[in-house]
Protein backbone atom coordinates (compact mmCIF):
# COMPACT_ATOMS: atom_id res chain seq x y z
CA UNK A 1 0.00 0.00 0.00
CA UNK A 2 1.49 3.31 -1.10
CA UNK A 3 1.27 5.93 1.64
CA UNK A 4 2.67 8.87 -0.36
CA UNK A 5 3.10 9.78 -4.02
CA UNK A 6 6.73 10.52 -3.27
CA UNK A 7 8.77 8.25 -5.55
CA UNK A 8 8.70 5.84 -8.49
CA UNK A 9 10.12 2.84 -6.66
CA UNK A 10 6.87 1.05 -5.84
CA UNK A 11 6.97 -1.17 -8.97
CA UNK A 12 10.76 -1.32 -9.17
CA UNK A 13 12.91 -4.42 -9.46
CA UNK A 14 15.92 -2.55 -8.03
CA UNK A 15 16.60 -0.41 -4.98
CA UNK A 16 19.27 2.17 -4.19
CA UNK A 17 20.74 1.73 -0.72
CA UNK A 18 23.73 3.04 1.23
CA UNK A 19 26.24 0.33 2.11
CA UNK A 20 29.23 1.45 4.13
CA UNK A 21 28.65 4.99 2.88
CA UNK A 22 28.48 3.98 -0.79
CA UNK A 23 25.24 4.22 -2.77
CA UNK A 24 24.61 0.82 -4.39
CA UNK A 25 21.88 -0.66 -6.53
CA UNK A 26 20.50 -3.96 -5.31
CA UNK A 27 17.93 -6.30 -6.84
CA UNK A 28 14.41 -6.19 -5.42
CA UNK A 29 11.26 -8.18 -5.98
CA UNK A 30 8.57 -5.99 -7.51
CA UNK A 31 5.09 -6.27 -6.06
CA UNK A 32 2.31 -8.02 -7.91
CA UNK A 33 -0.08 -5.24 -6.87
CA UNK A 34 0.27 -1.59 -5.89
CA UNK A 35 -2.58 -0.05 -3.93
CA UNK A 36 -2.73 3.74 -3.97
CA UNK A 37 -5.81 5.00 -2.13
CA UNK A 38 -6.24 8.60 -3.28
CA UNK A 39 -7.57 9.81 0.09
CA UNK A 40 -4.54 8.32 1.86
CA UNK A 41 -2.10 9.66 -0.76
CA UNK A 42 -3.67 13.12 -0.55
CA UNK A 43 -3.28 13.12 3.25
CA UNK A 44 0.48 12.52 3.03
CA UNK A 45 2.77 15.37 4.10
CA UNK A 46 2.94 17.93 1.26
CA UNK A 47 6.75 17.71 1.30
CA UNK A 48 6.55 14.06 0.24
CA UNK A 49 4.10 14.80 -2.57
CA UNK A 50 6.31 17.69 -3.71
CA UNK A 51 9.30 15.36 -3.71
CA UNK A 52 7.46 12.92 -5.98
CA UNK A 53 6.48 15.79 -8.27
CA UNK A 54 10.10 16.99 -8.54
CA UNK A 55 11.34 13.45 -9.20
CA UNK A 56 8.82 12.99 -12.01
CA UNK A 57 9.66 16.36 -13.57
CA UNK A 58 13.27 15.18 -13.85
CA UNK A 59 12.38 12.29 -16.20
CA UNK A 60 13.13 14.25 -19.40
CA UNK A 61 16.62 14.83 -17.95
CA UNK A 62 17.02 11.07 -17.47
CA UNK A 63 15.82 10.29 -20.98
CA UNK A 64 18.19 12.90 -22.45
CA UNK A 65 21.09 11.17 -20.69
CA UNK A 66 19.90 7.78 -21.95
CA UNK A 67 19.78 9.06 -25.52
CA UNK A 68 23.22 10.64 -25.07
CA UNK A 69 24.60 7.31 -23.79
CA UNK A 70 23.21 5.60 -26.90
CA UNK A 71 24.67 8.20 -29.28
CA UNK A 72 28.06 8.62 -27.61
CA UNK A 73 28.76 5.21 -26.08
CA UNK A 74 26.52 2.91 -28.11
CA UNK A 75 24.58 1.80 -25.04
CA UNK A 76 21.34 -0.10 -25.43
CA UNK A 77 18.16 1.86 -25.89
CA UNK A 78 14.54 0.74 -25.96
CA UNK A 79 11.54 2.64 -27.33
CA UNK A 80 8.95 0.87 -25.15
CA UNK A 81 9.86 2.73 -21.92
CA UNK A 82 9.42 6.01 -23.79
CA UNK A 83 5.99 4.87 -24.98
CA UNK A 84 5.04 4.00 -21.40
CA UNK A 85 5.94 7.53 -20.29
CA UNK A 86 4.47 9.29 -23.34
CA UNK A 87 2.47 12.27 -22.11
CA UNK A 88 2.93 11.44 -18.41
CA UNK A 89 5.10 14.42 -17.49
CA UNK A 90 2.84 16.77 -19.44
CA UNK A 91 -0.26 15.43 -17.66
CA UNK A 92 1.34 15.86 -14.26
CA UNK A 93 2.50 19.40 -15.10
CA UNK A 94 -1.09 20.19 -16.15
CA UNK A 95 -2.25 18.95 -12.73
CA UNK A 96 0.37 20.98 -10.81
CA UNK A 97 -2.06 23.32 -9.05
CA UNK A 98 -4.24 20.42 -7.97
CA UNK A 99 -1.21 18.47 -6.78
CA UNK A 100 -0.04 21.47 -4.74
CA UNK A 101 -3.54 21.69 -3.22
CA UNK A 102 -3.42 17.91 -2.54
CA UNK A 103 -6.54 17.40 -4.64
CA UNK A 104 -7.15 13.62 -4.70
CA UNK A 105 -7.67 13.39 -8.48
CA UNK A 106 -4.50 15.38 -9.13
CA UNK A 107 -2.45 13.38 -6.64
CA UNK A 108 -3.80 10.26 -8.34
CA UNK A 109 -2.35 11.48 -11.65
CA UNK A 110 1.01 12.01 -9.93
CA UNK A 111 0.91 8.52 -8.41
CA UNK A 112 0.03 7.04 -11.80
CA UNK A 113 2.92 8.94 -13.40
CA UNK A 114 5.37 7.76 -10.75
CA UNK A 115 4.15 4.18 -11.12
CA UNK A 116 4.52 4.32 -14.91
CA UNK A 117 8.01 5.74 -14.43
CA UNK A 118 8.92 2.73 -12.31
CA UNK A 119 7.38 0.39 -14.87
CA UNK A 120 9.42 2.06 -17.63
CA UNK A 121 12.58 0.99 -15.79
CA UNK A 122 11.29 -2.57 -15.54
CA UNK A 123 10.45 -2.58 -19.27
CA UNK A 124 13.94 -1.34 -20.14
CA UNK A 125 15.74 -3.67 -17.75
CA UNK A 126 17.72 -0.64 -16.57
CA UNK A 127 17.10 2.45 -14.47
CA UNK A 128 18.16 4.72 -17.36
CA UNK A 129 14.64 5.81 -18.46
CA UNK A 130 14.09 7.34 -15.02
CA UNK A 131 17.55 7.90 -13.55
CA UNK A 132 20.36 9.84 -15.19
CA UNK A 133 23.02 12.30 -14.09
CA UNK A 134 20.51 14.06 -11.83
CA UNK A 135 20.18 10.88 -9.79
CA UNK A 136 23.95 10.35 -9.71
CA UNK A 137 24.36 13.83 -8.23
CA UNK A 138 21.64 13.14 -5.67
CA UNK A 139 23.32 9.83 -4.76
CA UNK A 140 26.66 11.65 -4.43
CA UNK A 141 25.03 14.14 -2.04
CA UNK A 142 23.64 11.17 -0.08
CA UNK A 143 27.13 9.69 0.24
CA UNK A 144 28.65 13.02 1.29
CA UNK A 145 25.81 13.54 3.75
CA UNK A 146 26.39 10.13 5.25
CA UNK A 147 30.14 10.72 5.52
CA UNK A 148 29.93 14.27 6.85
CA UNK A 149 26.68 13.96 8.85
CA UNK A 150 24.80 16.48 6.71
CA UNK A 151 21.09 16.86 6.96
CA UNK A 152 19.88 15.81 3.52
CA UNK A 153 16.71 16.75 1.70
CA UNK A 154 14.12 14.40 0.27
CA UNK A 155 15.30 12.35 -2.71
CA UNK A 156 12.94 13.88 -5.27
CA UNK A 157 13.78 17.43 -4.27
CA UNK A 158 17.50 16.68 -4.52
CA UNK A 159 16.89 15.15 -7.95
CA UNK A 160 14.89 18.21 -9.02
CA UNK A 161 17.70 20.59 -8.06
CA UNK A 162 20.29 18.35 -9.74
CA UNK A 163 18.15 18.24 -12.91
CA UNK A 164 18.25 22.03 -13.08
CA UNK A 165 22.04 21.92 -12.70
CA UNK A 166 22.47 19.23 -15.36
CA UNK A 167 20.10 20.99 -17.76
CA UNK A 168 22.12 24.20 -17.47
CA UNK A 169 25.35 22.27 -18.05
CA UNK A 170 23.86 20.46 -21.05
CA UNK A 171 22.74 23.78 -22.58
CA UNK A 172 26.23 25.18 -22.08
CA UNK A 173 27.83 22.16 -23.72
CA UNK A 174 25.45 22.30 -26.66
CA UNK A 175 26.23 25.98 -27.20
CA UNK A 176 29.98 25.36 -27.54
CA UNK A 177 31.40 25.71 -31.02
CA UNK A 178 32.95 22.61 -32.50
Question: In which residue ranges do the predicted regions lie?
Answer:
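A glycine/threonine-rich phosphate-anchoring loop and its flanking beta-alpha core
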Residues: 3-91
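Active-site segments that bind and position negatively charged phosphate/pyrophosphate groups
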Residues: 83-178
Amino acid sequence: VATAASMNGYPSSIGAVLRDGLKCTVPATPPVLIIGDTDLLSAAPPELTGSGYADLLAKPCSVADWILAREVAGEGFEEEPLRIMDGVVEAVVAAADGIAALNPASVESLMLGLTLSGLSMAAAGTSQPASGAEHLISHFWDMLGHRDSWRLDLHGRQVGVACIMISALRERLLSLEE
